[in-house]
């Protein structure tokens, strides 16, 4: 027994008693003292350590009675009573903690570490028997452990608080260092709060009574058996204690070298809060409040019945965890750095990134009974927010108004990034350098496209990269081989000065609704009684679920079953710009260049996602409302549904919606000027995308099972895309309503993404580019990109219906719709549409695909052109070799092949069509664009010669071949668009620019082809029809001669040169072999003079040139000579079977044959075997001159062409008799045709070609006797 008028101070005391009767006139102090020590180590580290002293213990083996006139102060003290405890505290009973820990500061060479680590030791109360505790003031326990062995009562006139003790530990550190060319600095700050809740235990019923409020915050009341009864005159708060965690860091790192330096700075700031809820658990739980009961993020659960009764409100809601974080990163490089690809830069580059995020996450409360009933009564409002009510049996909620709804989780994320670069860059230039640089960039682009799941763009980038590698390799080889000329590749080094900047911002804000639930094994009943005012007495269940065997919703006014809405809002924007000027030096000399580009874009999206409310009853669902019942975005499902609505019944579905839009545009251009030429280019792209979706995800309605529905509505029943359905027989379905209206909801989904672009360029002289329209020397054009178009439209209907059954309209005079037309089929009512895709990603992929298709399009067209050129040149070479070898059939076959591979040829066009289909298909992503690409490429290839004519015509008109070439490209592009749309236009432009426009050997090949074609045609005709015609003509003439009486002055049958008529008159055809019995010796038609006899020849005549001229008087008939026949035959071509009539002055032509002519009559008699002159029209070319033509670069057509253009000079033909074909001297005037670089001299009298010079031979010395005009 201890009785005192003052304080009883048992600090760090250890008191033991068999029983205790303690009466303190003032305070009772049961504290455990703390002690603090300070230490300094040898290395300068300091430590301040706080520890507990001897524990304060008041140990009573039996019963204890404690009475105080003042407060009972217990900090880390221990009260242990083996029997019953009877306590009467006159003041407050504070069960607190003592904080211990260590504050340590360590000084190091590179920084300081400052740590403060703390923990709390709470008080304990352990009672073996029953407890009867009265507190005149407040009972406050923080981090305490209370064990009331056999239960009892704890009552306080003030507040009863079971709370959590809090301690905070901090870490602060900084360090820095400088190691020559490297330095760093780091700071760290961390603060972590730790909570220790109060734990109340008992072996039997425990009553906690308060004259004010009861607060269970972050703490636990856990009884092994018995009930936990909490009764307060004020509020009962069962909630969460919140701990806070903070982390901050700053870092800087720098490195400097001889040629470069790097600085990196980063920071991180993060704050989070975590809510630690409370728990009340017992066999049964009863909570009564004179005001409000608030359960926040906590659990109240009983094995048996649980009851919450409040005079005012009952709020069962959530607690929140929160987080906020912000990070920054800055990186700066200076000096020498990579410039991308094979280039390097000297300058500065900066990267700055910022990220912010925040979130609020709700923690649900749970109130319920495992095996019993849950009853919640509120004098005013029962509000269940984002939480759960559960009972093994029944759940009953009664209040003036009842709200069961959702709590809102939120997230926010934002990112910003800025980059900038300026300085001097050194890299490769020229066409070879450009190809190498582009190969590297296209390879990188292919990887990025693959990461972005854009397979088409990745494939196209890979094609372009492979082409750039090949063209770069070919160009490099050509340089090593010493290639010269306007199409020769170039390489050099470029030094440029420039700057670039880019920025990007994006953000996303989301809200997610966490609905509530009510789950009962038996019945779930919610009753809103109202308080007599018109607007009270409502039940609202939003985005939540009620599940029970039977559900009853009874409201004095309205029953509102409605949806909640999640939202997702995104915003983004980007911009970039750059410019540079440079100087290059390389195989094309010195050059200058400049470029500029700019881009910007934005995107926004707003989405709303609906969460339906669900009322599910395995047996009966009953809804009774004095006013309206609204089932909006909600579903009532039960075996039987009964509804009695005093107002209107509104059932409506709600739509998820998404609205999105994105835009992206870019433009850039540049020029280069070198000593050998220059070029300029420009490109632009623009893309726009939008999407709009509205669709019912879950249709609203009332669905009954085999029990049917019985719905009575005093006012109007309105169905908007909703239903009242049943699987029962129609006899069990009844709808009685004042009036009935129905309507459908139209769902739709639309998206459209379109991207377009073009590149334009031109070059004069020698181009130093390998890619783009300005890469073709002396040409240019506009190349459209393959238009990108992705779109989709869907529509569907969410219909209204009422299952078959009885429909009674009680206000027929107000009924506006014909009930007979009502849809009674409640199956498949909700027509759905697909949601729209991410239009911003779609737009990004479209831009990537367009760029890839353009790069690959040039590669494919150029590669096919090179292959076709090779095939063409090889075929022409084969034709030439076959012609010279006398294989005319082989020559013609090779020429036919060459024609197919020439510009405008079918073989070339077929390959270009294949390439166009490949690029068009990959670029446009459809069979239609593949067909369009093929059509455009094929058309452009087949019409290459027409495009060349356009180029020449426009070029001649404007005086600029470049303008002509651009006009040809535009024409090809337009033609491609007409036959193949955008893909056709792009492929047509590629073929014209990178194939035909890039074919420097086209004209030369055309000339070679024309020359060879004529030679082969002439030779074929000569050796075929011409051979037969000449022989048969000779046979007929010989027949005249042989049939002369007595042989005349000619050969007689005994002469060696005699040939019988029978042998001569065999029919000769193309390819006929002349045998020994029909040899036609040359001397047969020749004479040695008047009356002479021909000597036997030694070879058979094989060409018309070997036939001797029939001169005046050379051949005589019985009545005169045959000179008239020769005169008549001077210019008349004779074909197969041509004959000269024995009558003077006449000649008859036979069937037509090639190159078969009878000799001329002028000029006397030619010697046997001598080739006579062949008249080709205006001019005559003898054998000697004919042999010189090809060697000096002429064809007969070209000789005739320059003669037709008129003379350019005069001279004289003074050839001696030994140099003329007829053996007669010349002393005639002559005209000169052509030019000094290639001319022809023609005798004005005879038309003979006297002389030809080397054609286009710069070293040829013209005849000094020529008088030039």
From Swiss-Prot:
Q: Where is this region: Disordered?
A: 317-340, 491-518, 1124-1155, 1207-1231
Region (CT domain, has tRNA nuclease activity), start-end ranges: 981-1269
Recorded superkingdom: Bacteria
A GO molecular function held by the record: RNA nuclease activity
Annotated segments matching region FHA-2: 1-251
- Coarsely, its chief localization is cytoplasm
Assembly, in brief, is: Specifically interacts with cognate immunity protein CdiI, which blocks its tRNA nuclease activity.
Family statement: Belongs to the CdiA toxin family.
Q: Can you say what this protein is called?
A: tRNA nuclease CdiA
UniProt gene name = cdiA
